[in-house]
Every structure is written in structure tokens, then in C-alpha cells.
Swiss-Prot record:
It is a multi-pass membrane protein. Residues 786-885 are annotated as: Ion conduction pathway. Residues 1183-1203 have a biased composition (Pro residues). Changing residue 737 to H: In RP45; uncertain significance. GO terms for molecular function: calcium channel activity; cAMP binding; cGMP binding; intracellularly cAMP-activated cation channel activity; intracellularly cGMP-activated cation channel activity; ligand-gated monoatomic ion channel activity; protein-containing complex binding; sodium channel activity. It comes from Homo sapiens. Residues 888-964 are annotated as: C-linker. The keyword Ion transport applies. Residues 1-656, 710-724, 774-785, 885-1251 are cytoplasmic. Its main location: membrane. Residues 1148-1154 are annotated as: Calmodulin-binding CaM2. Pore-forming subunit of the rod cyclic nucleotide-gated channel. Mediates rod photoresponses at dim light converting transient changes in intracellular cGMP levels into electrical signals. In the dark, cGMP levels are high and keep the channel open enabling a steady inward current carried by Na(+) and Ca(2+) ions that leads to membrane depolarization and neurotransmitter release from synaptic terminals. The lineage of its organism: Eukaryota, Metazoa, Chordata, Craniata, Vertebrata. This is Cyclic nucleotide-gated channel beta-1. The chain crosses the membrane at residues 657-678, 688-709, 725-744, 761-773, 786-808, 832-858, 859-884.
Length: 1251
């Protein structure tokens, strides 16, 4: 009957083994059921439970939820224990009645079909025994039985069932926080310990309400055995008064009062604030411990059914400080206010989805799951830590099974589960309305931590091990939002070691209102701090958990702190660099650092010409060809394989032009000799075979041209060059040229068989004139001086017209008869030459010709005159055009020269300047062939101009150091803007102080940079490839004036780039612009750096002192300076010492200059002025030169030593001098930074003696 219910309702994931007691119960035919009375729930608890369930899911809770008995009902049951004893007899009689048996059978069947909650963890056996033997939990059986006996009537039972479901439908206020503060005493399992004196007396009854009526204690192993009564706590006076005020049991007024009382409890009541501050703020919290008994042989790792409940305290903001072991007390009234605001919560959809999954599994294994065993759980005592926490607001441990369950949930499963759940709920609701609801364990936030005994309890033994669960993150995940960060110190380990599972809890707020995916959970885990990171670890009896946990926390914290420190240091470094860059830009906006300057595009090498690559390709081919002759083996050049091209380019292929030359020669043979053979008697039977041989050779050339060459010529169609063989052949066959070529090869030679060999039959061979014109155009395109060929061709036209006229004259003479008249040819001499002479005189109309006598002669002569005038006029005009085109450049040059000379004469320019201008015209014309190259480039497109500029100027511009590293395309654009200018010898290219608007690149020749005081000293000579004028052109540092004079040394050809053109180019290349400015700034800085000029000696360095003079000075020193000679010698001696001092100072100055120049080469920046000033000061502060002892007489004479201490070390000492002739030499800075003053001082006494 209930098979469909079993298939519809979800079943537990595993089927545990049946105990012996269960087997015995199944054998019994009619088990006796203890009368169970639905206890009256506490109003506060009932309201709390009704709040935890939304209205839309109430119908589901009607089937599975059971209300806990309230403390007041428990007290009433304890006071009326005698009434319960009397009611047992009536209960047994009612149970034995037929209607009661049907209900009992129906209840037993439903209990077997409806799945029971599955729990995975148990307590220690010691704790279970303690719960069962003594304590407050043992007091729940007797009063419950008494109440059951009181409320066993079916009508009253139905009312209780309606009331219970009404309470679950309507929202209720949250449970007082006092209950949660008193629960840890029960969770410890120490029943023998009395309650603390400071706690109120109502603690015991409220804790009894935590027990479910269907959870018997583990002590009574037999169903009918009753536990020993434990001393019950004193009931409240208020509850006693309430009990005593009610009417008798059978009175109808009692029923009405009871209904009104139940309605009051069912309807929502105002929130009553509990007592606060009963727990000391510094008292340590206790970890949540759940003790669950696992039957032997069951699943080792049972699947846990998890439920997600939205926490009401997610958005709460309270000032709560944490202690190392637990959280501080939260005011109860604040928590209740927050709980009222968060009353509507959603129940998890996981249960519905799990039911669908289990339904599919049970359909496949229908036969095996008909006999479902009940899971026997010893007890479920859950203690929560914290003040102001409601039962539904506890945190739930997050385990690996939770994560697997989240992964299994999908969007499609949600929709299907909701649809199926609605259909099933309607069917189940109709059937459950006819029977009593079953006693189920209340579904809470932690379904894996709560359990329920179906029929009887089994104590924990060796066969029934226990596993203790500890919530290790009680302080890291407080129930209320805290301002202070959670403590990273782990709580002390649990006393149980080998059977403890450490489950750190995680804030459930991260999983609310949606089912997170695997990626979302990974991101949330990464976002957690080391104290909040969920870690699941099985304890090891050999490893202390506290040390391991602290090490993990410390290592994680140290890793995070190291990463944060590295990141902060990196940010500080970046900020410093950015600050320095901003400062640098504020000081000089044009300054760019090396990092900002773009990396120049790698300079691509110009493509190598094709002839250079061909030998490289041919080398490996040559290595393969060897020739073995006799005893030696040598390599020989392989035979080149010539293959006729598949297509021929008629514009650039020189072989085709050569072939056209042969075709034109054949055509000229026919055009010149056919008239001669027809008119003159030069073709005779004796030489006929020679004439025919040449004729047919020309015909073969014609035929090859038509069949081989013309059918392979490329052509342009739609802008594309067609190289397909079929298309080229079709193109030729459809052209006019093919028709003319075909007519030129008409086989009229077969008529020779009838009329004989007549040259006029070959006259169609002259129709191949189109090949002649094509040859002329191709030849002119490849000739450097095409006008020469044009002149020759024009002359040929004139000669051919004379040739035809001579042939006609001989034919006319032969027609009338040779020598018949005075006008005709008389037949004397060479007939062709005499006729040709007559034709020349006739066409040119020289005169002196014989007068025609006959009509034929007159008509023929008139035709000659008209032909001659027309032909010669055309020839002369064409000749003029040809010659004019050949000398057009020279004519332009002369016209420009004449205009310039006329201009200079008009303004009376000096002859020297005029001569320089004329020289420039002549040199420019002869060197370039034109005066201005830009005029030639104007007609060409940009691409061709760029190609020409690259070939002409790229090799020179690429050598310029200033443009190295710049964009290659920028250099190409710059090449098109360059102008070529020729400078004559000693011409000033630019002068110092002028405004710089151009930059110069030397193409050919040399220029000299002048400087010095007079501005005529040659500082440096620049050769081809050098550049100057770029600093003023780039206007770096605000200066755009020339810094030196530049003069052309000889004829110099320069490329000029205007400032305007360069700026237009650099606009499109900002990276190259920065690079050029940076280079120009460095060059300007190096040029402006003060260079130390070599000190000019007052007196030139003297030559070495003669030995004889030194000997004389030595003798004078001995004599002691007596007489005039002694005074003169002393004066000379002092003079020599001055010269020696000057020489030493000059050497010291040279050493200083060398040191500073080496520093400049290394690139060290800084002013050299301070260095220049330090040395003179040191020399000025030097003490006087020490007096040298007199020189011994036998010492060899040598040059006197310098008096300055600044001479280089290692220099040999001079000869010893007398003391009275010592002097003091000082170096002091001059008024200008680069000047120094040398002063020579003598003591006053010595000066007097010297005088």
C-alpha cells in the first residue's frame, strides 16, 4: 500500500545494518507502542521555529517536523506524574482497540517508508553514559509519558496536530538568548556536576525542551523499562499558577481555554528581551561538540545531507571584541532586533534536489530498499557558544562533502526538483491528512550534526565507535559581524585525539541566495585570510594538533606578509620613478629618458642585387660537377641549360629586341631588293638560286616570328599582365598584326611555275612593316642617345625614296627604249648609279635636267617633282625636330645663362661675381646635365621619385650619424625632400650668427669649418657623408643661429633639407623626433662644455744650458758674487730660475689638461672650471721653494731646477744653488675663468743684494 510513498519520498543515502534488537522487533507480530503525547511547546520556542520556515514551504514541514516540548509543559508533566500513571491503563486499552491498531500499523509503515535523518559523528562512550545515567536529560521521559496518557484521545490528538502545523506555518519571534547561554552545561555531558549558583532555576526546564520526544536515552535498553527518576529542578511559580488555574480535565471549559491558549501561542507575540550580561565578557567559548553513534558495518563515510540557511546576522554591525579563545558577549536585545528584521529566510533547495536524485536511484533498486532499517543514534547534544545566538543562526561546518554537494547542484536540477516537489507535495498532503504525522527530528542548519533514534537507542561500545567533531573556528567566524579582525590563534585541542575531526567553520554568508559553482568557491577560498581559510585535518595521535595548526597559520601569515611587502616595495619604487620623470619634464619638457625613447627599428639591409645572388646559388651546383681524366679529377663548369621562355615581355626583354632586328633585316631585304630585281636586269638564270635562297631565308624568319615569338608576347588586360600561353596566343590571333603578317606570307611563289620567277610576286613581303615600327620604339627606349638613331632613320627614309625613284626611272627608260631620247637613260655605265643620280637631281630640283619630250616623260617628271617636294619637306622638318630635341637641354642652359648675364649687366654686377655665376652654370650643367633636378622629378609619381632618390642619395644619408636609429620610412620621406646645390670654391655655405633654416649633407667635395680669433682658422674639414647645421635646424635649447662659419673647399655638391620640410616629416614620426632632439641636445651640450685652451707661455721654452755656462755659474757661486760680474751673474741666475719655473708650470698645466680630456672621453659631465681654479690656488698656497745647498765644485753642471713644487715626480734634481738666490713663483686665477696669472717673487733682502 505504501510502496508509492517509498518511491516518492527521498531515502537516506546509505542503508545501515540492523541490530539484534531491530531484528527481534521485526519478528514480533504486533509490537506494543508506547503512548506518546504531543507535548505543549513553549510559546517562545514555537514562535522561533515557525519563524525559521517560510510559508511557501510549510506543507513540507507538516510531514516531517515535530515541535519540541516547552519547559512549561515539562513542568506540568512533572507535577502531575500521578495522572500519567492512571492514564497508562486507558492508553493501553485504546491501543488495543481496532481503530488504534490501524493507526499503529499505518504509523509503523510510514516510519519504514519515510527516510530518517542520517548523522555521521558520535560522542565518547563516557559522555553517553553520563547523559543516560544522570542529568537533566533523564527527566524528560516520565513527564512526557504522563502527557501522552493525558492526550491520547483521537480528537485531542487531531487538535494537537493542527495546532503544531499552525505554529510551523505562522512566523514566531526568535528564541531568547538565555537558552543558548545555558546550553553548554548540557553539551559537556557532566550530568553529576550541579548547575552554577549564579544561573537561574529555569535553566533545567529550558534545556529539556531541546530534547526531542522521539529521542530516548541510551540507558533503557529494553522498551518497557523506565529510567530512574532524577531530582527535577524546582518549577517556576508562574508555571505553577498557570497549571493550577486551569479547569478540570473533563470539563468543556478547559477545552475552550486550552484552544484559546493554543491560539495565543500560535499567533505571533511581541518580542521579550532576555537577560543580558549573565556570561562574563572574558569567559572563553566552548567549541561545538557533537556525539553520534555509528553502527558497525555501516558506511564508513556516509553522505551528508546539507542544508543552506541564510544567516540573519550577516549585515549586523556591533562593536564586539574577540578574545584568543572565543568571542565576547553580544547583547541579546540587539540580536533579537536583527533576527526580527531577517525573519523571512529561504530553506535550502538541496533537500529537494537530493530527493530527486535518490528517487532515481531507488527506482533502479526498488526490491533491495523495501526493507529499510532505521538508523539508531544514541543522542545528539549540540552546544553552541555565544550570547544572543538563535538555534537557526548557528554556523555550519564546511567539509569536503559539502563542496562535492555544491558541485552536483545545477540549474536544470533546480527546475526539475521544484516541479516534482510540487506534484509530490500535493499527493503526500492528501494522504497525510488522513493519518497522524510522524515524529521526525527537526531539520536545522546542521543536519549532519543532529540525529534521532527511530525506536530504541544503542549505547556506544567497541562495536559502535564514536567520532568527536570539534568546531575549531569558533572565534574566526563569529555569529555577529565584528569590527575587529578575527583572531588567528587556534583554540586548544580537544582531549580526544584518535577520534576527533577538526572541522573549521566558514561564514555561510558567502553561500547565501545562490548555489555557488566550483570557480566561485575557489575565489572565495582565495579571498579568505589565513585564520578564515577552511582546513580539514584528521588528527594524528603522534602529532600534536595545536603545534601543527599554529605552524600552518604562521606559515600562511608569513607568506602573505612577504607577498604584501614585496608588492608595497614595488609600488614605492614605481612611484619614485614616476616622480622623478615628472620633475624632469617640469624642468625641461623636451628631455626624454632612455626608457621613454623608442627603440629604433632595426636598419634593414638593402636587398642585394640579383647578379650577386646568382653566383651564390650556382656554387653548390658547381661542386657537383667533376670530370675524371686519366689520373686526376678536376671540377669543370657545367653546361648551361637554355630554355625558350614560356612568355616574353616585349618592353624589357633584350632578346626579343634582337629578334626584331633580324625580322627588320628580312623586311628591309624585301623592301630594298624587290624593286631592284624588278626594274634592273640584275636577276639572271645563272644567279637565280642565290636570290631564291635569300628569299626563302627571309620567309623562314617571318614564319618563326609568327609561330614562336608573337604567340608568346605578354600583354596587359584590365591592369594585369597576362602570361598564360593560351591567352597570349588568342590575343595575337585576334590582333591586326596577325592579319598583316599572314598577308605578308601569302604563298604566291607557286605562280613561279606558270609565269616564271617574277620578283613582283614577292611584293606582299613588304607588308610586315609593323615589326619595323615596333623595333624602332624598343630600340629608342634602350638607347641612351635616341636622337642619333632618329637622325639615321630619317636619313634612311630619304634614301629609300631616292631608291624607289631611281628604279622607276630605269623602268621608264627601258619602257621607251634605252637611248631612244635625250631624257631617257642611254645605257652607258652603271645603270643603278646613273639612275640614282638622276633621281637625286629630280627630287631635290637642282636643275640642269633634260626637258621631257613625250607625254609619258612629262607626266613622270611631274610626279617626281611633287614627290620630291613633299618628301624633302617632311624629311627636313623631321630632321629639324630630331636635332632640336637632341639639343634641347643645351638650349635651355644657354637661355638661362643668357638671361642671367643680361640681368647682371643690367644691374652692373661686378665682374668677379659675374664670373662666379657663369662658373656655377657651367659646372652644374656639365656635372649634372641639368640645372635643377626637381623639375625632372615633378612629372614622376611619388613611388618612382622615391626609388630614384633611394638609388641616388640613400648611401650617403645612411652614413649620417644623426639619422642612425631613426625610422627607415622617415629617411625615405626625407630623401624626397632633398635639394642638390653646387657651391664654388671659397663660397660661404653658412656664416656664424645667421638664422639656421637648412641642414646640409655633403654629397661630393669638402667643406671647412672656420674659427679662431680672426674667424679664418680652419678648425675641421668635413668630407662626403658629413652633416652640419642640424643643431640650429632642430632649434634645441632655444638656439637657431649658426655657431660657426662653413666654407666650401673646391667645388662641393651639397644636399639641402629645409626646416619646413623636416618639421612636416617629423610630425608623422614622434619617436624619431624625440631621438633627434636628444642627440642634438647631447651635441649642443658637448659643444658648450668649456674646453681648456692650452696655456700660452710668456717665454718659449729655452734650449738646454751649455756646459761651459754652467761651469761659469758654478765658479761664480764659489766667488760669492763680488764685483760687477758677480752681480750680473746673479741677475742671470735669477732669470734662469724664472724660466725654469715657467717650464715646470707649463708641464703641470699640460698634465691637468690631459687628465680632464680623458674624463671628457669617458663621458663624465660637469664643468671643468672648478678644476681649473683649484690648481692655481694650491700653487699659490704652496710654501716657498726650499733652499738648495751650494753645489760642490766637482759636480757636473746641469740645468737649474724649477722653483715650483708642482713638477712631476721622478724628475731629476738640478744642481745645487746658493741660498741667497732663491725665488718664489705663484700661480693665481685671472679675471676670467680660463685665465691664469704667473707671478715671480723674490725676498726683499735678495732683491737688494741683486741690485
Amino acid at each position: 500500500m505504501l510502496g508509492w510513498v517509498q518511491r516518492v519520498l527521498p531515502q537516506p543515502p546509505g542503508t545501515p545494518r540492523k541490530t539484534k534488537m531491530q531484528e527481534e522487533e521485526e519478528v514480533e507480530p504486533e509490537p506494543e507502542m508506547e503512548a506518546e503525547v504531543e507535548p505543549e511547546p513553549n510559546p517562545e520556542e514555537a514562535e522561533t521555529e515557525s519563524e525559521s520556515m517560510p510559508p511557501e514551504e510549510s506543507f513540507k514541514e507538516e510531514e516531517v517536523a515535530v515541535a519540541d516540548p516547552s519547559p512549561q509543559e515539562t513542568k506540568e508533566a512533572a507535577l502531575t506524574s500521578t495522572i500519567s500513571l492512571r492514564a497508562q491503563g486507558a492508553e493501553i486499552s485504546e491501543m488495543n482497540s481496532p481503530s488504534r491498531r490501524v493507526l499503529t500499523w499505518l504509523m509503523k509503515g510510514v516510519e519504514k517508508v519515510i527516510p530518517q535523518p542520517v548523522h555521521s559523528i558520535t560522542e565518547d562512550p563516557a559522555q553517553i553514559l553520563g547523559h543516560g545515567s544522570t542529568g537533566d536529560t533523564g527527566c524528560t521521559d516520565e513527564p512526557n509519558e504522563a502527557l501522552e496518557a493525558q492526550d491520547t484521545r483521537p480528537g485531542l490528538r487531531l487538535l494537537l496536530w493542527l495546532e503544531q502545523n499552525l505554529e510551523r506555518v505562522l512566523p514566531q519571534p526568535p528564541k531568547s538568548s538565555e537558552v543558548w547561554r545555558d546550553e553548554p552545561a548540557v553539551a559537556t555531558g557532566a550530568a553529576s556536576d550541579p548547575a552554577p549558583p549564579g544561573r537561574p532555576q529555569e535553566m533545567g526546564p529550558k534545556l529539556q525542551a531541546r530534547e526531542t520526544p522521539s529521542l530516548p536515552t541510551p540507558i533503557p535498553l529494553q522498551p518497557k523499562e523506565e529510567p530512574k527518576e532524577a531530582p527535577a529542578p524546582e518549577p517556576q511559580p508562574g508555571s505553577q499558577a498557570q497549571t493550577s488555574s486551569l479547569p478540570p480535565t473533563r470539563d468543556p471549559a478547559r477545552l475552550v481555554a486550552w484552544v484559546l491558549h493554543r491560539l495565543e501561542m500560535a499567533l505571533p507575540q511581541p518580542v521579550l528581551h532576555g537577560k543580558i550580561g549573565e556570561q562574563e565578557p572574558d569567559s572563553p567559548g566552548i567549541c561545538d561538540v557533537q556525539t553520534i553513534s555509528i553502527l558497525p558495518g555501516g558506511q564508513v563515510e556516509p553522505d551528508l545531507v546539507l542544508e543552506e540557511v541564510e544567516p540573519p546576522w550577516e549585515d549586523a554591525h556591533q562593536d564586539v571584541s574577540t578574545s584568543p579563545q572565543g568571542t565576547e558577549v553580544v547583547p541579546a536585545y540587539e540580536e533579537e532586533n536583527k533576527a526580527v528584521e531577517k525573519m523571512p529566510r529561504e530553506l535550502s533547495r538541496i533537500e529537494e534536489e537530493k530527493e530527486d536524485e535518490e528517487e532515481e536511484e531507488e527506482e533502479e533498486e526498488e526490491e533491495e530498499e523495501e526493507e529499510v532499517t532505521e538508523v539508531l543514534l544514541d543522542s545528539c547534544v549540540v552546544s553552541q557558544v555565544g550570547v544572543g545566538q538563535s538555534e537557526e543562526d548557528g554556523t555550519r561546518p564546511q567539509s569536503t562533502s559539502d563542496q562535492k554537494l555544491w558541485e552536483e547542484v545545477g540549474e536544470e536540477a533546480k527546475k526539475e526538483a521544484e516541479e516534482k516537489a510540487k506534484e509530490e507535495a500535493e499527493e503526500v498532503a492528501e494522504e497525510e491528512a488522513e493519518k497522524e504525522p510522524q515524529d521526525w527530528a527537526e531539520t536545522k542548519e546542521e543536519p549532519e550534526a543532529e540525529a534521532e533514534a527511530a525506536s530504541s537507542g544503542v549505547p556506544a561500545t567497541k562495536q559502535h565507535p564514536e567520532v568527536q567533531v570539534e568546531d575549531t573556528d569558533a572565534d574566526s567566524c563569529p555569529l555577529m559581524a565584528e569590527e575587529n579582525p578575527p583572531s588567528t590563534v587556534l583554540p586548544p585541542p580537544s582531549p580526544a585525539k584518535s577520534d576527533t575531526l577538526i572541522v573549521p567553520s566558514s561564514a555561510s554568508g558567502t553561500h547565501r541566495k545562490k548555489l555557488p559553482s566550483e570557480d566561485d568557491e575557489a575565489e572565495e577560498l582565495k579571498a579568505l585570510s589565513p585564520a578564515e581559510s577552511p582546513v580539514v585535518a584528521w588528527s594524528d595521535p603522534t602529532t600534536p594538533k595545536d603545534t601543527d595548526g599554529q605552524d600552518r597559520a604562521a606559515s600562511t601569515a608569513s607568506t602573505n606578509s612577504a607577498i604584501i611587502n614585496d608588492r608595497l616595495q614595488e609600488l614605492v619604487k614605481l612611484f619614485k620613478e614616476r616622480t622623478e620623470k615628472v620633475k624632469e619634464k617640469l624642468i625641461d619638457p623636451d628631455v626624454t629618458s632612455d626608457e621613454e625613447s623608442p627603440k629604433p627599428s632595426p636598419a634593414k639591409k638593402a636587398p642585394e642585387p640579383a647578379p650577386d645572388t646568382k653566383p651564390a646559388e650556382a656554387e653548390p651546383v658547381e661542386e657537383e660537377h667533376y670530370c675524371d681524366m686519366l689520373c686526376c679529377k678536376f671540377k669543370h663548369r657545367p653546361w648551361k641549360k637554355y630554355q625558350f621562355p614560356q612568355s616574353i615581355d616585349p618592353l624589357t626583354n633584350l632578346m626579343y629586341v634582337l629578334w626584331l632586328f633580324f625580322v627588320v633585316m628580312a623586311w628591309n631585304w624585301n623592301c630594298w631588293l624587290i624593286p631592284v630585281r624588278w626594274a634592273f636586269p640584275y636577276q639572271t638564270p645563272d644567279n637565280i638560286h642565290h636570290w631564291l635562297l635569300m628569299d626563302y631565308l627571309c620567309d623562314l624568319i617571318y614564319f618563326l616570328d609568327i609561330t614562336v615569338f608573337q604567340t608568346r608576347l605578354q600583354f596587359v588586360r584590365g591592369g594585369d599582365i597576362i602570361t598564360d600561353k593560351k591567352d597570349m596566343r588568342n590575343n595575337y590571333l585576334k590582333s591586326r598584326r596577325f592579319k598583316m603578317d599572314l598577308l605578308s606570307l601569302l604563298p604566291l611563289d607557286f605562280l613561279y611555275l606558270k609565269v616564271g620567277v617574277n620578283p613582283l610576286l614577292r611584293l606582299p613581303r613588304c607588308l610586315k612593316y609593323m615589326a619595323f615600327f615596333e623595333f624602332n620604339s624598343r630600340l629608342e627606349s634602350i638607347l641612351s642617345k635616341a636622337y642619333v638613331y632618329r637622325v639615321i632613320r630619317t636619313t634612311a627614309y630619304l634614301l629609300y625614296s631616292l631608291h624607289l625613284n631611281s628604279c622607276l626611272y630605269y623602268w621608264a627608260s627601258a619602257y621607251q627604249g634605252l637611248g631612244s631620247t635625250h631624257w631617257v637613260y642611254d645605257g652607258v655605265g652603271n645603270s643603278y648609279i646613273r639612275c640614282y643620280y638622276f633621281a637625286v637631281k629630280t627630287l631635290i630640283t637642282i636643275g640642269g635636267l633634260p626637258d621631257p619630250k613625250t607625254l609619258f616623260e612629262i607626266v613622270f617628271q611631274l610626279l617626281n617633282y611633287f614627290t620630291g617636294v613633299f618628301a624633302f619637306s617632311v624629311m627636313i622638318g623631321q630632321m629639324r625636330d630630331v636635332v632640336g630635341a637632341a639639343t634641347a637641354g643645351q638650349t635651355y642652359y644657354r637661355s638661362c645663362m643668357d638671361s642671367t648675364v643680361k640681368y647682371m649687366n643690367f644691374y652692373k654686377i661686378p665682374k668677379s661675381v659675374q664670373n662666379r655665376v657663369k662658373t656655377w652654370y657651367e659646372y652644374t650643367w656639365h656635372s649634372q646635365g641639368m640645372l635643377d633636378e626637381s623639375e625632372l622629378m615633378v612629372q614622376l609619381p611619388d613611388k618612382m621619385r622615391l626609388d630614384l632618390a633611394i638609388d641616388v642619395n640613400y648611401n650617403i644619408v645612411s652614413k649620417v650619424a644623426l639619422f642612425q636609429g631613426c625610422d627607415r620610412q622617415m629617411i625615405f620621406d626625407m630623401l624626397k625632400r632633398l635639394r642638390s646645390v653646387v657651391y664654388l670654391p671659397n663660397d660661404y655655405v653658412c656664416k656664424k650668427g645667421e638664422i639656421g633654416r637648412e641642414m646640409y649633407i655633403i654629397q661630393a667635395g669638402q667643406v671647412q669649418v672656420l674659427g679662431g680669433p680672426d674667424g679664418k682658422s680652419v678648425l675641421v674639414t668635413l668630407k662626403a657623408g658629413s652633416v652640419f647645421g642640424e643643431i640650429s635646424l632642430l632649434a634645441v635649447g632655444g638656439g637657431n643661429r649658426r655657431t660657426a662659419n662653413v666654407v666650401a673647399h673646391g667645388f662641393t655638391n651639397l644636399f639641402i633639407l629645409d626646416k619646413k620640410d623636416l618639421n612636416e616629416i617629423l610630425v608623422h614620426y614622434p619617436e624619431s623626433q624625440k631621438l633627434l632632439r636628444k642627440k642634438a641636445r647631447r651635441m649642443l651640450r658637448s659643444n658648450n662644455k668649456p674646453k681648456e685652451e692650452k696655456s700660452v707661455l710668456i717665454l718659449p721654452p729655452r734650449a738646454g744650458t751649455p756646459k761651459l755656462f754652467n761651469a761659469a755659474l758654478a765658479m761664480t757661486g764659489k766667488m760669492g758674487g763680488k764685483g760687477a760680474k758677480g752681480g750680473k751673474l746673479a741677475h742671470l741666475r735669477a732669470r734662469l730660475k724664472e724660466l725654469a719655473a715657467l717650464e715646470a708650470a707649463a708641464k703641470q698645466q699640460e698634465l691637468v689638461e690631459q687628465a680632464k680630456s680623458s674624463q671628457d672621453v669617458k663621458g663624465e659631465e660637469g664643468s671643468a672650471a672648478p678644476d681649473q681654479h683649484t690648481h692655481p690656488k694650491e700653487a699659490a698656497t704652496d710654501p716657498p721653494a726650499p733652499r738648495t745647498p751650494p753645489e760642490p765644485p766637482g759636480s757636473p753642471p746641469s740645468s737649474p731646477p724649477p722653483a715650483s713644487l708642482g713638477r712631476p715626480e721622478g724628475e731629476e734634481e738640478g744642481p745645487a744653488e746658493p741660498e741667497e738666490h732663491s725665488v718664489r713663483i705663484c700661480m693665481s686665477p685671472g679675471p676670467e675663468p680660463g685665465e691664469q696669472i704667473l707671478s715671480v717673487k723674490m725676498p726683499e733682502e735678495r732683491e737688494e743684494k741683486a741690485e
